[in-house]
Design a protein with these regions (language model features):
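Surface-exposed helix-capping loop/turn segments at secondary-structure junctions
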Residues: 54-59, 108
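Glycine-biased flexible loop/turn sites that connect beta-strands or occur in inter-domain linkers
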Residues: 15, 70-71
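ATP-dependent carboxylate/phosphate-activation module, predominantly the ATP-grasp catalytic core
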Residues: 1-56, 79-101, 123
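Peripheral (often C-terminal) accessory segments that flank ATP-dependent C-N-forming ligase machineries
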Residues: 68, 98-128
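Short, flexible segments with low predicted structural confidence
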Residues: 44, 71-72
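A short glycine-rich, hydrophobically flanked beta-strand micro-motif that places a catalytic Asp/Glu
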Residues: 58-70
Length: 128
């Protein structure tokens, strides 16, 4: 019924949240985001951090939330992996791969705040 959000989250090995990058799914084709907007939403970020800590998740997590008929956000998916649109977060300035590698190598990691951008993904036909 309402707006759908995908949120990329990274947590350290103690389930402490390092970053959350929410994005509105403005258009999808066959379940894949083709238009998205990175947004700043403290409520969404807190909800994601809370559920990830409760579940003791670690590493890269991809969550999806959707507004119900009353506009209330509900979790619809929690995936312990990179999502298909995680690259959108990288385009917004948050390099998830670098953060994960730093965590694995026990290095101090720098986490940038995401740039609030819109992204459009295009597919091309290829004839061989």
């Amino acid at each position: 019924p309402g707006m759908e959000y995908t949120i990329d989250v990274v947590l350290d090995d103690q389930s402490n949240p390092l970053v959350a990058v929410p994005r509105k799914r403005l258009q999808t084709k066959e379940g894949i985001s083709t238009k998205a907007e990175i947004v700043k939403d403290d409520y969404i970020e807190k909800m994601c951090f809370d559920i990830c800590k409760f579940l003791k998740l670690k590493g890269s997590i991809c969550l999806q939330m959707k507004e119900d008929v009353n506009g209330k956000l509900k979790f619809v998916e929690i995936n312990p992996r990179f999502g298909g649109g995680t690259y959108f977060s990288t385009l917004a300035g948050v390099n998830f791969m670098e953060i994960i590698l730093d965590l694995l190598n026990k290095k101090t990691t720098k986490v940038n705040s995401p740039n609030l951008i819109k992204i459009m993904r295009y597919y091309n036909e290829v004839v061989i």
